Amino acid sequence: MTETSQWWRSVFICLCLAVVTAAVYWPVRHFEFTNYDDDVYVTENPHVQGGVTLRGIVWAFTTPHFNMWMPLTWLSCMLDCQLFGLNAGAHHLVNVLFHIANTLLLFTVLNRMTAAQWRSAFVAALFALHPLHVESVAWVAERKDVLSTFFWMLTMLAYVHYVEQPNGGRYLLALGLCALGLMAKPMLVTLPFVLLLLDYWPLGRTRWAQSAIGVRKERSLGYLLREKLPFIALMIPASIVTYWAEQRGGLIVLLDSLPVGMRVVNAVVSYVRYLGKAFWPVGLAAFYPYRTWSLVVMCGAGAVLAGVSGAVIWRARRQPYLFTGWLWYLGTLVPVIGLVQAGTQSMADRYTYIPLVGLFIMVAWCLPHSLVEQRKPRMVAVATAAALLVSCAVLTGFQVRHWKNNETLFRHVLNVTKDNHLAHENLGRALLDQGKFAEATAEFAALLRIKPDSANAHNSLANALAGQGKAAEAIAEYAAALRIKPDLAEAHNNLGLALAGQGKLAEATAEYQAALRIKPDLAEAHNNLAITLIRQGRLAEAVAECQAALRIKPDLAEAHYNLGNALASQGKVAEAIAEYRASLRIKPDNVGAHNNLGAALASQDKVAEAMGEYAAALRIKPDYADAHYNLGVALANQGRIAEATTEYRETLRLRPDWPPALVGLAWILATSSNESVRN
């Protein structure tokens, strides 16, 4: 085959890979953000939502936010927000584009190293379509996975370019790309090890193996190790910073909580569990709770690993791709296998995004070899490969759909796992946000059965109870949360809300102040304290609290609204109007802001504008008595008595015996020129 025809075949393969991958992941364009880290990465991160700014860039490079230093990932999320705002579907599609790019780069690198187009294409297709990779692609918070892998693949391509014709410029290009990858996610710490494996096969740079493309540039092991030292030098500070950031964020699990023995057992078992899910990808979940394994299970898993490793070493000279693929799989999982435990998961699908490439290489090269040994026709290999890819595509299509929103995601997780505290918690939070308080209560109760000493669970259950109007039960749960964790600022804040709802303003004020002593940057506590101060007539203090909330969280619509209320009560109508408008720009469906803006405009004799705001409030909430009353007043002042009467009557239907509405309606009836109406 000519070089030109090979090039066109490669183009055709790339087009097919891109189209099929895009088709499988196309549904994500309608998906939502989840409450599983997407809030920290995007929806509640003001630095990211501000787009690419100098201040944001400085923050990204100087702050180990959310337990990891990954400035390029933050910049990528910032750029998304600048281009698409909070359009979740667009953020998802960017992840898909990176996944497609990674797929094409993997094909390109393997094809260049091996000149085996179809086998390289098969590896790339498995990478693109395997269900275990859905988590890395369909989850916005895993931008770090697809972005760091993009630089991983570029580094490998640049390294192959360097090996073909070694010079300083090509080497520095590979080194620079590796450094960029580390700034997206420190998963690249194992890349020098993988480059050594590639030196063995398929590059054939050692005296123990032949090059896959027949070009042998033999180097000593010492030379190859020295060649990787600059890469290793990058990994050392990256590893230290990552460990420090995770420890600083409380993510590192200490040895007294999780002994070394349990970690080793989980690591050995997880290697085999990942293998099982690679070849039988069912029951996949966004979170796998930590489990204890018996010695029998651990020994069985160890025997599997030892058996495969022994077979690979035995066949290493005849089938070097087995050696490279297997050690790729084992080695790239080391940072995330749980020996240094970060978080409470026992394993995670996303951790396989890079490691599975090693297994795919083993399958892609071993399958044809086995069929040749068994004298099977070539079409058997083609049919087997096609069946595998179709199966992966179908399973991935189903798995993708679980990531549509919080409810679909965590209901699926609960269906395929047991005693999953995180799934109960996040599903409960999602139901709480939807106002499904009874269902949320059930989820938080289930969470407490699993983790009875969880202060956050008691706090969340209390929120659900408060939403059902069960104030006494909610207060008891907030108190339980604070007995377990007295410095839980959110529980103090929420307890303040419950007490304020009972009219216990002094006690509520004390709880808000307690929350702010613990967490001075809790904008919601500043805002809630302001509401209580307004109710106590302490307007100057309320204004100060609203302003404090807005310094922390400029897009907190409720703080703008309450600041408007405080200013209006001080007679600063123009300033109040500005705050109401600011609140409505952020949250256009805030009926209180529409109504109060209308009242402020009416006080400036801007009656037409005021009536427009009352009407806007009633379009959103037709049973809003205050807006009906204010609209009635405005209509009466315009002499539109019949319409005003209708609004007053509607007000009294919603709030019987409300004095202002009774007085307004009585005045109309008493002063009407129609005698029958007066009587």
Predicted regions and their residues:
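Conserved alpha-helical positions within TPR/SEL1-like repeat arrays
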Residues: L422-L432, N456-G467, E490-G501, E524-R535, ...
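Polytopic membrane enzymes that build or remodel cell-surface glycoconjugates and lipids
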Residues: M1-E439, E443-A445, R449-S460, G467, ...
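Short coil/turn linking the two alpha-helices of tandem helical-hairpin repeats
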Residues: F398, G469, G503, G537, ...
